[in-house]
């Protein structure tokens, strides 16, 4: 039998950060209350914290305006960090040589659920 409480989500694609760096920050707030997670992300000094914080704020806004839910009763059910595409660039070196530089991109999906 399905539960009646909704699962609210928000996602962001094509973020200029590697999935590994995003996962380090996502592990801090996975399965935590939304109020605790926003404070953790606000005081975390990593760039990935700002990217995850924006997606989390979007999910909170979806919960408030689309479902009329209270923020205090929400927790982060799951955070999915996925690999997107990789751009390859060339960095010139000495004596006519060149190295490749990989610029990695990621996708984030956050799903919230109401505490029952």
Curated annotation (Swiss-Prot):
One of its GO terms (biological process) is translation. The lineage of its organism: Bacteria, Pseudomonadati, Pseudomonadota, Alphaproteobacteria, Rickettsiales. Keywords: Ribonucleoprotein, Ribosomal protein, RNA-binding, rRNA-binding. GO terms for molecular function: rRNA binding; structural constituent of ribosome. It holds the Pfam family Ribosomal_L22. The keyword rRNA-binding applies. This is Large ribosomal subunit protein uL22. InterPro entries: Ribosomal_uL22, Ribosomal_uL22_bac/chlpt-type, Ribosomal_uL22_bac/org-type, Ribosomal_uL22_sf. This protein binds specifically to 23S rRNA; its binding is stimulated by other ribosomal proteins, e.g. L4, L17, and L20. It is important during the early stages of 50S assembly. It makes multiple contacts with different domains of the 23S rRNA in the assembled 50S subunit and ribosome. It comes from Wolbachia sp. subsp. Brugia malayi (strain TRS). GO terms for cellular component: cytosolic large ribosomal subunit. Belongs to the universal ribosomal protein uL22 family.
